Amino acid sequence: MRSIVILILLMLQLCAVMATAETSGVPEKDTKNDLAIIAPNDFNATLNYSYEEIDRHALNAPASAESSVDSLAAYLIEPAGNDREKARAIFRWITENIDYNVEVFFKGGTGPTNSEDVLKSRKSVCYGYSDIFLSLAREAGLETIRISGYGKGYGYAPGKNFSGLPNHAWNAVKINGSWYLMDSTWGAGYVSVDKKYVRKFDDHFFMTPPSQFIYDHFPEDAQWQFLDEPVSKQEFENLVYLEPDFFNLGLKLGQRNGTISADKQINISIYAPEDVLMMAGLEYVDGGAAAGDGYTFCQRDEERYDIYAQFPAAGSYILKAYAKQKDEPGEYNSVLEYRINAASGDKESPGFPMIYGKLSEAGGYIFSPLEGKLKAGSSYLFRIRVPGAGNVSVVCGEEWTDLASRGVDLFEGNATAGKGDVGVYAKFHGAGWDGLVRYNEE
């Protein structure tokens, strides 16, 4: 009967979250005092502020208002009650109506970037986006500047150095005596891997706190960082690559350097709210191909996620972390990337076990075993924390080995691996058995 249950459970787990992992990693510094990159000259932009009405107005601009920069500016600021709403209306109109000119971009040019030309053609690159923002904002009576510098945009990979002319442009607006950063180019959408423009509004790039903006924007003039302690270009290049969802989900860094040297394995910590789930993956720097299954492992330990990685050979890798809200359907989104320079590797390594989504959702944690392949006939100590579980069992074929409860949420016991895969299952109160972890036969 239990073998039938196992088969059903395995089928139900096809949609579960998968991650891969390792054991004796090199731990990063484990203190929250190290999380801030610098003390930002911050402001109250992150306070809850509803832009629903001003956004609706901007998104419904009639063609008659879009005939010139001055007429468009006049229309956009009609219902604005303050300078913040003026800036928002301009930002929202641009992000909805201007396409990124991928054809010109991939030819290495800029095309027309004058605000009037951009208004007519409805397409440009970052210099055109920032110019039309500048023109509309000034027409609206806002003190505005255009900033040139380096951006970690399309084609960027962790560890890349910037040289030559600036590759990006954005804006800053002065509101109530404070400067606010915004990037209407990146707020409008992105260029996909197949070199096509995808319109997708990203609110992160409107009034972004300087302490977040610096991770992917480096101005030529350090004063436009708006930081108490400006970072150098080299420091900027060394910062970990963070996606907007890293900030949107409330994540915090345990290691801010984007390039890390390691031996055969590494361990990195990410602090995350309780309602956030995470997973990880490993790719080769050259070509972006996945390194294979079993080389990464990600699990929560109270307020942080521990991400482990092993390397099949010496070389350079991109370690990626993905995250999502616990109660939201859909895929995990990329939140950060590290470049790992591994001095050595082990292709014969047993790797890490496969974690199913139920373990992550329950806030479980595997203490042992952490190797992904178990030798048939060998005995292993299984030690796992599973909040809310009434029973936890190790299953090999038709043999079930119940783990003993060792206090609050902790289960442990010895079990012998047999031929085939080994699974760990939990029975939660009032529910059936759920798969938590799977090990392969060595």
Residue ranges of predicted features:
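Composition- and surface-driven signal marking solvent-exposed, interaction-prone regions
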Residues: 4, 185-186, 282-283
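Secondary-structure boundary elements
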Residues: 25-125, 131-140
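Hydrophobic/aromatic-rich core segments of domains that either
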Residues: 130-212
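Alpha-helical and coiled-coil interaction segments, frequently adjacent to or embedded
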Residues: 192-442
